Amino acid sequence: MGNLIKELQEEQLRKEILTDFCVGDTIRVATKIVDGGKERTQTFQGTVMARKGGGAGEVISLHRVAYGEGMEKSFLLHSPKIVGIEVVKRGKVSRARLYYLKGKTGKAAKVKEYIGPRSAKK
């Protein structure tokens, strides 16, 4: 029974590499949105606060401050609605979860930029 579930989950995984980012990176996620009969692409840019789960159920949480208000949005990483993920800036952090960014605005909500080679956690 367990092998059958694993096989079904592996079929749902996306083959292209969308996981070349870590917690602390600023990324831009493009998703497909259906408005009435039209289909368009919407982007959301934010700092990766957490990566949870694994396999087909892996979830990323992004945080961004817009117009003085903090916003948090979660995405299923292997969802067919995700068109693409682009890394805008690499961040240098010492934590696996950045929930302390939730109440911060301005300079306090910034993550130091990392310059240099880095391999993503898989």
From Swiss-Prot:
Domain of life: Bacteria
PANTHER family for this protein: LARGE RIBOSOMAL SUBUNIT PROTEIN BL19M, RIBOSOMAL PROTEIN L19
GO cellular component: cytosolic large ribosomal subunit
Organism: Chlamydia abortus (strain DSM 27085 / S26/3) (Chlamydophila abortus)
Gene Ontology MF terms: structural constituent of ribosome
Classification via Pfam families: Ribosomal_L19
Family named by the database record: Belongs to the bacterial ribosomal protein bL19 family.
Entry function: This protein is located at the 30S-50S ribosomal subunit interface and may play a role in the structure and function of the aminoacyl-tRNA binding site.
NCBIfam families, sorted: rplS_bact (TIGR01024)
Keywords: Ribonucleoprotein, Ribosomal protein
Name of the molecule in the record: Large ribosomal subunit protein bL19
InterPro entries reported in the protein's UniProt record: Ribosomal_bL19, Ribosomal_bL19_CS, Ribosomal_bL19_sf, Translation_prot_SH3-like_sf
Gene expressing this chain: rplS
Gene Ontology biological-process annotations: translation
